Amino acid sequence: MSSLEISSSCFSLETKLPLSPPLVEDSAFEPSRKDMDEVEEKSKDVINFTAEKLSVDEVSQLVISPLCGAISLFVGTTRNNFEGKKVISLEYEAYLPMAENEVRKICSDIRQKWPVKHIAVFHRLGLVPVSEASIIIAVSSAHRAASLEAVSYAIDTLKAKVPIWKKEIYEESSTWKGNKECFWASNS
């Protein structure tokens, strides 16, 4: 086997790396093209409301599929200011039975409108410091248009219909924010 000698701060002068992986002649299992084409994967919706810090990597891993060429994400984070006030953190509360039900409806609506494979909606509850994610929505699909449109629909509809409340915590005060996009708060 050929090898490459590397000298850098990461390796000693004697480090040798293979240029190609070793060949394994007698593989225990070699999937045929037919096996790979017939892979059927059940679609899934993963919904989670949690006080734990959200991870973009963990949420995006939930929607990966060999049948899909696109994963679209929306990540909402706490910004450090609002109308000239310094924001320290946000605090979220939700009416969980209704919130979970409404998010399930959003997932169902998405599946009626676009050919998507997997959907994950994670929303943080409790305190969310500046720069941390409060919501992550991930959608996978065969092609990008479906997942991009589905993610946009998901965040817009979530803000309009899901009973989640946000308190902005400033340096010297705090205030519960009304969601202007929420259907039950509109004056019409």
UniProtKB/Swiss-Prot annotation:
Modified residues (Phosphoserine): S20
CDD domains cross-referenced by the UniProt entry: MoaE
Cellular component annotations (GO), alphabetically ordered: cytosol; molybdopterin synthase complex; nuclear speck; nucleoplasm
Phosphoprotein is among the record's keywords: yes
Pfam families: MoaE
InterPro entries named in the record: MoaE_sf, MOCS2B_euk, Mopterin_biosynth_MoaE
Record-linked SUPFAM superfamilies: Molybdopterin synthase subunit MoaE
UniProt keywords, alphabetically: Cytoplasm, Disease variant, Molybdenum cofactor biosynthesis, Phosphoprotein, Transferase
Reactions catalysed, as given in the entry: 2 [molybdopterin-synthase sulfur-carrier protein]-C-terminal-Gly-aminoethanethioate + cyclic pyranopterin phosphate + H2O = molybdopterin + 2 [molybdopterin-synthase sulfur-carrier protein]-C-terminal Gly-Gly + 2 H(+)
Protein family according to the UniProt entry: Belongs to the MoaE family. MOCS2B subfamily.
Associated disorder: Molybdenum cofactor deficiency B: An autosomal recessive metabolic disorder characterized by neonatal onset of intractable seizures, opisthotonus, and facial dysmorphism associated with hypouricemia and elevated urinary sulfite levels. Affected individuals show severe neurologic damage and often die in early childhood.
Miscellaneous notes: This protein is produced by a bicistronic gene which also produces the small subunit (MOCS2A) from an overlapping reading frame. Expression of these 2 proteins are related since a mutation that removes the start codon of the small subunit (MOCS2A) also impairs expression of the large subunit (MOCS2B).
Protein name per the record: Molybdopterin synthase catalytic subunit
Species per Swiss-Prot/TrEMBL record: Homo sapiens (Human)
Gene name for this UniProt entry: MOCS2
